[in-house]
UniProtKB/Swiss-Prot annotation:
This is Probable transaldolase. Gene3D superfamilies: Aldolase class I (3.20.20.70). One of its GO terms (biological process) is pentose-phosphate shunt. Transaldolase is important for the balance of metabolites in the pentose-phosphate pathway. SUPFAM superfamilies: Aldolase. Its EC number is 2.2.1.2.
Amino acid sequence: MKLFIDTANVEEIKEVNDMGVICGVTTNPSLVAKEGRDFNEVIREITSIVDGPISGEVIALDAEGMIKEGREIAKIHKNMVVKIPMTEEGLKAVKVLSSEGIKTNVTLIFSAGQALLAARAGATFVSPFLGRLDDIGADSIGLIESIVNIFDIHDIRTEIIAASIRSPKHVIDSAEAGAHIGTVPYKVLKQLIKHPLTDIGIERFMKDWKEAFNK
């Protein structure tokens, strides 16, 4: 499973990109607003750091507006992916944008049916939301498995991005369920790095080294 980082914070992106573990970035209006900077400015800076898919989301709710905004987002950089909400108007926009060769990421997916519709409309990516499904007691990983199964049976090339990830367990469960990509918040990526036994092991190695050579 490939890993993206889910943030609009440039410093977080730089830090994680330097580790060599991510190959893309997802943003949304909330994440960009949190940075208090111009959308285009933030996105352009991100494209200069990560050479991979960068999702930027439309604000419009009607198909015409989404298409217009999507075309503008696509012009920013060759790696841009237009993030579209899973609605009737969103599907119309995806159909048009995909026909123009513009990559799309249909977001706010909460059912296998929604994922199938988005894929058939031409979506490059679909983003089922794990954390929000967990909040209502739904089986989020079961949803990933269902979408993977449907796409495999019918040879659908749309990639599945596990989104709304809140813990390292979400990441591992998504990978085991067959998601192509997990888009992971900075905090969770950092949590994935650490393990108490790793720290203990390093301390023991250093102690043994000092005892052997620094007598």
